[in-house]
């Protein structure tokens, strides 16, 4: 069971704004409904020069050997805009990304990411600019992301970030919707008991 306490990984800088879900994973690869196997289609039209994935685009940053095992994506505002396809999140996770840092995200993409345990971090534009300058200067740089302390540590500098306390608690404990439902199962049963009791009394009264 994966509990997100902290993560240290190589950062890949993708200096593009308004990356939509069709760029993250094109629509022709959405035929499966399980979450496995979508990583090979991530940023397909940018990573490859042909539809059969035979010609790798040498200029796209994810194809650089330095970022082969990158697990943190640094990008710009409005990441994940466009259609609400959850496959976009699945492809990022399946590729190996654990954290995405940007100045803003699409609301639906943010929700889908939280539900799939992909940590999204929102920072001010000046912090994003600083981090881009840093990773472009020191190629292959790693960040440490502490969800407990809500901070990114790089080069002995701590950059704090905000996250909803409930979401942080769920990620730290690896709770999903089923887990949360089970935690209030006794309340649900009590509610059902009271409701059905009321309905039975009403039926008896009207019969």
Curated annotation (Swiss-Prot):
One GO CC term, this protein: 3-isopropylmalate dehydratase complex
Annotated pathway: Amino-acid biosynthesis; L-leucine biosynthesis; L-leucine from 3-methyl-2-oxobutanoate: step 2/4
UniProt-recorded Gene Ontology molecular function terms: 3-isopropylmalate dehydratase activity
A single BP term in Gene Ontology: L-leucine biosynthetic process
Pfam families with a match to the protein in the record: Aconitase_C
Superkingdom, natural source: Bacteria
UniProt xrefs under Gene3D superfamilies: Aconitase, domain 4
Reaction equation(s) it catalyzes: (2R,3S)-3-isopropylmalate = (2S)-2-isopropylmalate
InterPro entries with a match to the protein in the record: 3-IsopropMal_deHydase_ssu (IPR004431), Aconitase/3IPM_dehydase_swvl (IPR015928), AconitaseA/IPMdHydase_ssu_swvl (IPR000573), IPMI_Swivel (IPR033940), LeuD (IPR050075)
Enzyme Commission (EC) number: 4.2.1.33
HAMAP family in alphabetical order: LeuD_type1 (MF_01031)
Record family assignment: Belongs to the LeuD family. LeuD type 1 subfamily.
Function summary: Catalyzes the isomerization between 2-isopropylmalate and 3-isopropylmalate, via the formation of 2-isopropylmaleate.
Protein name according to UniProt: 3-isopropylmalate dehydratase small subunit
């Amino acid at each position: 069971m994966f509990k997100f306490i902290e993560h240290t990984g190589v950062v890949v800088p993708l200096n593009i704004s308004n990356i939509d879900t069709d760029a993250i994973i094109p629509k022709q690869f959405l035929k499966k409904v399980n979450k496995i196997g979508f990583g090979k289609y991530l940023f397909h039209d940018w990573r490859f020069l042909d539809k059969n994935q035979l010609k790798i685009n040498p200029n796209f940053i994810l194809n650089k050997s330095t970022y082969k095992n990158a697990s943190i994506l640094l990008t710009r505002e409005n990441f994940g805009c466009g259609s609400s396809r959850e496959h976009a999140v699945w492809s990022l996770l399946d590729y190996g990304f654990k954290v995405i840092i940007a100045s803003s995200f699409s609301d639906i993409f943010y929700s889908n990411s939280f539900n799939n345990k992909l940590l999204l971090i929102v920072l001010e534009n000046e912090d994003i600019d600083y981090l881009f300058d840093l990773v472009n200067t020191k190629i292959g740089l790693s960040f440490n992301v502490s969800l407990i302390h809500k901070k990114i540590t790089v080069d002995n500098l701590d950059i704090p970030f905000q996250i909803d306390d409930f979401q942080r608690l769920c990620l730290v404990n690896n709770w999903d919707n089923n887990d949360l439902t089970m935690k209030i199962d006794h309340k649900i049963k009590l509610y059902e008991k009271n409701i059905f009791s009321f309905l039975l009394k009403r039926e008896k009264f009207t019969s």
